[in-house]
Amino acid sequence: LYQVIYPHPMAVMVKRQEYLDRILQFKDHDVIKVITGMRRSGKSILLQQLRDELITQGISPDMIRFIDMDSLSNRRFYDGLVLYDDIMSSFKGERIYIMIDEVQYISDWHRVVESLRNDIDCDIYITGSNAYILSSDLSTLLTGRTIEFLILPLSLKELYQLGVGSGPDD
């Protein structure tokens, strides 16, 4: 029996607009957008929401490469060179948007990301857990061409939007 396993259903319903707005200020800037945060803080959901927002803004889905490294269907990309070659072979000369979820699973991920940024017209967004991608390492690994967005778990306001509790007294 085949069963689709989704992330926690409440997490999908919360649009993290504040984070989206902050990140999208840097859309099409020559800087790698790095989304970090503790486990289960919503980094993957936020990256999916970013993809959806780009499509809403008129970016063709064909111009967005979304790579979920948690999915075994992408296990061949654990080898960073395979991922690099795959993206390069599909590049048609127009700007593409590259989104890599859980980038730390890719060998030499920093070289892959930096090479893509240098070699093709692209806008790159990556996620990773704080345990694997530390702010202090980013500037040296990616030669300083990054901006980091620290994602926190749902706020009280966001929990109230979900109907969890009815106010500060709950």
Residue map of PLM features:
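Phosphate-binding site recognition
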Residues: 1-170
